[in-house]
Amino acid sequence: MRHVQAELSPSSEPEAGPSQPPVRQGTLQGGLLMGYSPAGGATSPGVYQVSIFSPSAGASEPPRALKRPAPPTEGPRELKRGPGLGAREGLPPEEPSTVGLLSPEGLGLGLGVASQHFSHHGLCVVEHGGNTTSPWTSGTQSTPWLSSNASFNTLHTRDWAFPDQGGQGCLGETPGPAPSGQLHTLDTDLHNLAQIGGKSPVARVGNGSNPWPRESHGTANGHSPEHTPPGPGPPGPCPTKRRLLPAGETLDVSSEDEGPAPRRRRGTLGCPLAANSSDAKATPFWSHLLPGPKEPVLDPTDCSPMGRRLKGARRLKLSSLRTLRKGPGLLSPPSASPFPTPAVSRTLLGNFEESLLRGRFAPSGHIEGFTAEIGASGSYCPQHVTLPVTVTFFDVSEQNAPAPFLGVVDLTPLGRKGYSVPKVGTIQVTLFNPNQTVVKMFLVTFDFSDMPAAHMTFLRHRLFLVPVGEEGNASPTHRLLCYLLHLRFRSSRSGRLSLHGDIRLLFSRRSLELDTGLPYELQAVTEAPHNPRYSPLP
């Protein structure tokens, strides 16, 4: 590395020629030490190192100006191209040379420390302000020392780019004669980095914004933030802060630290977009938050008395139709009772018997504990089974007249085929009360040998009390119904006969007491459908 050291001379006249500065003993005086290292050869970028020495703040020696003779007469100095720039444009690459030039303002400001080191790798510092005449180009005496608060605009550029000023192009073009203030490749206003007062390391350019965060000169490694060679971002640990340009202002292309700010969409809300969407397929979990259907517009005729009467009549008609279709028994939940309850409708059938069997009376209560034992005999004897019986009683009169009980035996626990019986034989059904006492034993004889496959039919077995001697001639008005057993039969596709569905029973809760002294006896009557006798399965 080659060094060029400049110190303040006690004489006010410039020296006759370039000479080595004397080495002073004792206190170090103010001066400037410049050096250049080719690093990797002529083709690799060099490193410029500038050391500014200044007396301490308490030094009593007044500041002195430095004068140097003008360099030999030469043409207008062109801006130095960076290594590799000429090769890209078809020009031969230039040899890097040791260039360390001072402006007269470089030594005019005292620093608060003994020395400051500035190392620039591929960095070009160009002066934008301060229209002063350089003593090296004009040969005149340098200007007096400026005050410490004097500010000069400096521009740091990377990749050897140069801003367009006064119609000049970039360094890639052939530059014309540059102003005297721009002939220096190193502006000595770099010492403004160490100034106290919160000034930016790079002077404000154009709009006066500060692209780098302010940082103290005492860093962790004891060097200035500018000691680190410039990289893709600004020097220092802080990331680059981009600014947003106001409307109507264009971006300053001369600043490398401020890139194009991202555009912010106006009118966007902080809430997510999906909150304003109505796509129920994409976001089904918030569909309940959507507004419900609009209320129907009221017809003006509904406010009139006639409209209200018509509306009420229509509601009553719809309610009655629903009641007839479903039945009152279906309106209650099925879990309200542990046993099945026949559907009840207010519409009665032709006689009292049919109305009870089909559940057209509303039940007054239920009795639990009844059981029924079912058996059959014939060509074979199936195993007897015992099933619970659901018993329901009714209140059908106001004179406390006896009303029969309705018992329902559900055959569903036996399976889909029901209880298998022979085609010709006898069925025995024994009813037990909660005390396991026999209430009634029913014996029914049947013959369904001519029943085709996949058909169904039923048998209704009744027990009447009739006067003795009138068994065959007893009128229906003289018969009293005591017990009833209703059985349903079905033949499978293979021809097997079985009981299916349920078994319904009617029985009295106490013995019938007759007022007359005529003797009565029980008469059994078994009936089956006649036309047709068998019906095909649905």
From Swiss-Prot:
<feature type="region of interest" description="Required for macropage invasion">
    <location>
        <begin position="348"/>
        <end position="430"/>
    </location>
</feature>
<dbReference type="GO" id="GO:0005634">
    <property type="term" value="C:nucleus"/>
</dbReference>
<feature type="modified residue" description="Phosphoserine">
    <location>
        <position position="255"/>
    </location>
</feature>
<feature type="region of interest" description="Transactivation domain 1 (TAD1)">
    <location>
        <begin position="436"/>
        <end position="444"/>
    </location>
</feature>
<dbReference type="Pfam" id="PF13915">
    <property type="entry name" value="DUF4210"/>
</dbReference>
<comment type="function">
    <text>Transcription regulator that syncronizes transcriptional and translational programs to promote macrophage invasion of tissues.</text>
</comment>
<feature type="region of interest" description="Disordered">
    <location>
        <begin position="165"/>
        <end position="185"/>
    </location>
</feature>
<feature type="region of interest" description="Disordered">
    <location>
        <begin position="1"/>
        <end position="99"/>
    </location>
</feature>
<dbReference type="InterPro" id="IPR025261">
    <property type="entry name" value="Atos-like_cons_dom"/>
</dbReference>
<feature type="modified residue" description="Phosphoserine">
    <location>
        <position position="254"/>
    </location>
</feature>
<comment type="similarity">
    <text>Belongs to the ATOS family.</text>
</comment>
<dbReference type="InterPro" id="IPR033473">
    <property type="entry name" value="Atos-like_C"/>
</dbReference>
<keyword id="KW-0539">Nucleus</keyword>
<feature type="compositionally biased region" description="Pro residues">
    <location>
        <begin position="227"/>
        <end position="238"/>
    </location>
</feature>
<keyword id="KW-0597">Phosphoprotein</keyword>
<protein>
    <recommendedName>
        <fullName>Atos homolog protein B</fullName>
    </recommendedName>
</protein>
<feature type="region of interest" description="Disordered">
    <location>
        <begin position="199"/>
        <end position="270"/>
    </location>
</feature>
<dbReference type="Pfam" id="PF13889">
    <property type="entry name" value="Chromosome_seg"/>
</dbReference>
<dbReference type="InterPro" id="IPR051506">
    <property type="entry name" value="ATOS_Transcription_Regulators"/>
</dbReference>
